Amino acid sequence: MSEPDTSSGFSGSVENGTFLELFPTSLSTSVDPSSGHLSNVYIYVSIFLSLLAFLLLLLIIALQRLKNIISSSSSYPEYPSDAGSSFTNLEVCSISSQRSTFSNLSS
């Protein structure tokens, strides 16, 4: 037990006063954070988050427009004075002009 075993990543030698001595393993030394891999991950995550925020903004705008369309269509009552008639103003004017033409022809 005079040589520390570096393959396990730590040594438990108590003779010289150290209880736990850590050594880098092959897995931790093979990953180099300065290689640019980590910066690529940050770029991809930032692109994903910005696209997600853009889609959320488009969804909010679409829901606002839909809310405005629904509220504007419900602000006009369904002609309560006409007893449930569903004629528009243009159709009512067209019918009244046809009646006046018919009354002029019949007299």
Curated annotation (Swiss-Prot):
The name this protein goes by in its record: Serine-rich and transmembrane domain-containing protein 1
Pfam families referenced in this protein's UniProt entry, alphabetically: SRTM1
Main localisation: membrane
InterPro entries from the UniProt entry: SERTM
Cellular location(s): Membrane
Entry GO terms, CC: intracellular membrane-bounded organelle; membrane
Regions crossing the membrane: 43-63
Topology in the lipid bilayer: Single-pass membrane protein
Entry keyword annotation includes Transmembrane: yes
Organism: Homo sapiens
Keywords, ordered alphabetically: Membrane, Transmembrane, Transmembrane helix
Keyword check for Transmembrane: yes
Organism taxonomic ancestry: Eukaryota, Metazoa, Chordata, Craniata, Vertebrata
